[in-house]
């Protein structure tokens, strides 16, 4: 009897957890056509970066990932790294954001040979400005936003890991 009760409680916990995570994937802040939020964070070198200035003109991709050095986040970053030249040829600037420390971002960038900036959002100002929800473990949800000339043209609130670059390239192919 105790085993059945424990099983049912675990099952109920999984169902509630899955429901909560799925409901957190929608973005309640940005809409297509909105400008890049003017918010600042430190990059992997400790330099203060204003996202609205980085975006400038042309295409700007900002992607959010839960935690450096985890399998899904590494696959997402490496997807963009591997397609970096093609994305650059299409004029796409890329910035990654997580709640990791500046030091962790630097180590992640170096270990994965990432040719783009990674921002440390310890105070959650960037995730807040973009409306990126926090997961049950307190980390930022995986999301991606593509801007053109400072205006949001596409968002992926359930961003892929190893297919992130292909998703962005597919959007660009339609334009």
Report the location of each language-model feature.
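Short, small/polar residue-rich loop motifs at catalytic or cofactor-binding pockets
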Residues: 34-35, 139-141
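A short beta-strand-turn-helix
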Residues: 39-59
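Short acidic-hydrophobic, aromatic-tinged amphipathic segments that line or gate anion-handling sites
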Residues: 117-121
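Thiol-/selenol-based redox modules, centered on thioredoxin-like
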Residues: 140-175
């Amino acid at each position: 009897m105790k085993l059945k009760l424990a099983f049912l409680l675990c099952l109920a916990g999984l169902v509630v957890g899955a429901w909560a995570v799925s409901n957190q994937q929608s973005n309640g802040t940005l809409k297509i056509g909105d400008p890049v939020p003017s918010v600042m964070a430190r990059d992997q070198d400790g330099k203060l970066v204003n996202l609205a200035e980085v975006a400038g003109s042309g295409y700007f991709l900002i992607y959010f990932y839960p935690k450096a050095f985890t399998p899904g986040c590494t696959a997402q970053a490496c997807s963009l790294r591997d397609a970096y030249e093609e994305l650059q040829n299409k004029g796409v600037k890329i910035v990654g954001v997580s709640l990791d420390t500046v030091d962790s971002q630097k180590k992640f960038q170096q270990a994965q040979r990432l040719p783009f900036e990674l921002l440390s959002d310890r105070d959650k100002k960037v995730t807040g400005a973009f409306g990126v929800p926090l997961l049950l473990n307190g980390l930022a949800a995986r999301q991606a936003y593509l801007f053109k000339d400072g205006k949001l043209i596409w968002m992926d609130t359930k961003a892929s890991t190893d297919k992130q670059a292909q998703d962005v390239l597919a959007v660009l192919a339609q334009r």
